[in-house]
Amino acid sequence: DMLDKVLVALEDEIDPLVVERGFVKDSDHSYYKKEYEQLKKFYDADKNSCSGFSYKIDSINQDFELWFRIDIDKDLAAGFCTFNVKENKLLISDVNTQLAIRSKFPKIPSGFCINDTWVYYELLPENDDSRALNFKRYNDLYYSLYDDEKFKEFINNCKATITRVMDICK
């Protein structure tokens, strides 16, 4: 199916990028295992599953890690989240942790605490809500992916956005 095709292609494209930057793919936490199960059920879910791939960038303190993430909701997003090691879940941390993130990664745009999960994110493929892929209510972009050339172009545009977002933590 198209979701699997997109995810496999994105993972193939970003794996070398994360290795090059020293990010570590998460597969140790029960969160990851739960997410993988959610990914398999994405289309059948009545609600958004918010699944995806997570890569550890760095520890912020003993309780929190900064993760790079490709997230699948109704659309695709790439960005940074904090992971609470003790609670085994993604969440925005306390003010001191947010200040530590800002200090350690000054390229993260100001006003970076977007919502309860994200530190910063951009929509894929081009951080434009009007051109975002929609896996829940199939839009024109979704249907265009069945054309091989348009699929390649989509993956390349996603890769460019992902690279730009990853470079914030260089």
Predicted feature locations:
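Polyanion-binding interface signature
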Residues: D1-R137
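Mid-to-C-terminal oligomerization/interaction "stalk" domains of large proteins
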Residues: L123-C169
